[in-house]
């Protein structure tokens, strides 16, 4: 999406995730040395929790430098997605401040069948399927939206 946020319909999400993940689930990506340790620190937080507000992820992960870019990279690769919004609470449990994004692995938001449905295809095949789907919108430069 040219470095910007975007929306992907659920009927395209399997191929989109397969393309952006280059055919890897996160553990395999990390084991092959293609994901930094900061990404692993963040993803490990979701082993026991379904969604976590972004400010808590920063505190729990212990990542000081490069936190925002680590989260952005995980979102671009479709390993994390915004699952909702929450607000901080004061000592009296009253909400205050701006809404804050809660992040989750998309498998927990949309279901594993939707997210991993194209894992049997190569990333190149997923790209071809997405380009075919976007072809009617080609005048808008739509296929350029597929590259990270």
Model-flagged regions — what are they?
Residues 1-148:
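Long, low-complexity intrinsically disordered regions
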């Amino acid at each position: 999406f040219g470095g910007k946020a975007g929306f992907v319909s659920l009927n395209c999400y399997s191929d989109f995730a397969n393309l952006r993940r280059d055919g890897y689930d996160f553990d395999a990506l990390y084991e092959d040395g293609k994901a930094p340790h900061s990404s692993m620190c963040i993803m490990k937080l979701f082993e026991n929790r379904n969604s976590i507000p972004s400010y808590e992820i920063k505190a729990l992960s212990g990542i000081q430098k490069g936190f925002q870019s680590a989260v952005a990279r995980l979102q671009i690769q479709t390993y994390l997605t915004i699952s909702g919004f929450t607000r901080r609470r004061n000592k009296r449990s009253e909400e205050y401040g701006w809404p804050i994004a809660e992040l989750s692995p998309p498998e927990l938001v949309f279901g594993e069948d939707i997210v991993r449905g194209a894992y049997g295809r190569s990333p190149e095949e997923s790209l071809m399927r997405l380009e075919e789907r976007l072809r009617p919108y080609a005048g808008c430069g739509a296929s350029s939206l597929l590259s990270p």
